Amino acid sequence: MAGLELSGLAGKVAVVTGRGRMRSIGRSIAVEMARAGCDVVVTGTGRAPENYPDDEKTAGWRDIESVAEEVEATGQRALAVVSDVSDPASVEALTAQVLGEFGRVDFIVNNAGAARGPDRVPVVDLAIDDWMKVIRVNLTGTFLMSHFFG
């Protein structure tokens, strides 16, 4: 992030959700937090490689594993965890795994978002199931992460 310098993160632990895409803002957040001295847990839904866009396939991208490697390249610890932020059991399991590995969490970055295409239509054309997915990930997911890690 050009022009932005983070401070006060040395020795802290962060969980960044929804950062499996190569062009995700979550990727930049995770890497910059690591550069500032933060250990980072990165989460995503674990997309299958056949669902990667062409630029990710060409680059040899591996979803959250690639970002975890970028975090580790800064000298910080990283943990990549496949997790569905909209599912209470998944978030509870994530919480247990992260606390077991790091002992605490100092920051949650609720970056996961479901807006990927089917919901980008006039509201009268929007399928109810597509709307409900957006609500589950964007709203309920943020609540669950804050609730379990809070």
Protein language model features and the residues they cover:
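Conserved NAD(P)H cofactor-binding loop of Rossmann-fold oxidoreductase domains
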Residues: N111-D119
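The beta1-alpha1 cofactor-binding region of Rossmann-like NAD(H)/NADP(H)-dependent oxidoreductases
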Residues: W61-R62, V82-L94, I128
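Rossmann-fold cofactor-recognition segment
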Residues: E69-P88
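A short, exposed helix-loop element centered on a Lys and neighboring polar residues
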Residues: S146-H147
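Canonical Rossmann dinucleotide-binding motif of NAD(H)/NADP(H)-dependent dehydrogenases/reductases
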Residues: G8-R47
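Conserved glycine-rich Rossmann-like NAD(P)H-binding loop of the short-chain dehydrogenase/reductase
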Residues: C38-S66
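Substrate-binding pocket helix/loop in short-chain dehydrogenase/reductase
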Residues: D119-V123, A127-M132
